[in-house]
Amino acid sequence: TNVTGIATLFPEVVQFIVRKETGINSLAQMEGRKIAVGSKNSGTYYNAQQVLTLAGVWEKIDQQFIGGTDAMKELQEGKIDGFIFTSGLPNPSIIELAKKVEITLVPVEHDLVQKIVNSYSFYFPSTIAPNQYPGQTDEVSAVEINAILVSGPSLSDDDQYLLTRHLFGKPNELGQSHPRLSKMTRNSLRRQMPIQTGKGAYRAHSEAP
């Protein structure tokens, strides 16, 4: 594919959600359990594969290739034990789910966080603050990735440059347009992307203050 990166927009946290009644409190305890890992080849699927492989449990869980609202519905109905979901915090759908069934957010242990960050340049240490979700009273250790703005081959280098320059020129104004963009700054726009930066975007990044 000829997709290139424009800029980093906001962090998304890789969340491991299980039914509280399963008693699962660590990634290792997911062994043998039915865990929804996202649709095959989706972003969530790759996050699940990367994190759980380094945790040593990817091959040991009963992988269910469903994601999003389907996974939440199956968890609510007791058909699966847990699921992985990558999103900004808090996620409204998970808030609604937690009102219907007791859930646990499974932490990514600190040693594993370092292992993940050292293995993949696009992961960063993260925490899920208390009370993001109903019943979640403790801080939860996690990892995050960045949602990025990408460009296809139909966008010219010049247009790519103008778009990127606009982002750098008005991050605060754009941040007011949507809650997910509220923490966007010139520094956050520069965070490393997992794909190559486009030529026009690179020029704008180089010129930005």
What kind of feature is each model-predicted range?
Residues 1-31, 36-39:
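Short, glycine-/small- and polar/acidic-enriched structural segments
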Residues 1-3, 11-13, 32, 100-103, ...:
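Extracytoplasmic
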Residues 16, 30, 48, 75, ...:
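Residue-level signal for nonpolar/aromatic packing positions in well-ordered secondary structure
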Residues 22, 57-150, 154-155:
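Pocket-lining segment of extracytoplasmic ligand-binding domains
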Residues 26-35, 55-58, 77-79:
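Short, surface-exposed connector motifs at secondary-structure boundaries
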Residues 42-48:
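Secondary-structure junction motif
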Residues 53-57, 76-80, 99, 165-172, ...:
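Sec-exported extracytoplasmic/periplasmic mature domains
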Residues 139-209:
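Segments of small-molecule ligand-sensing domains
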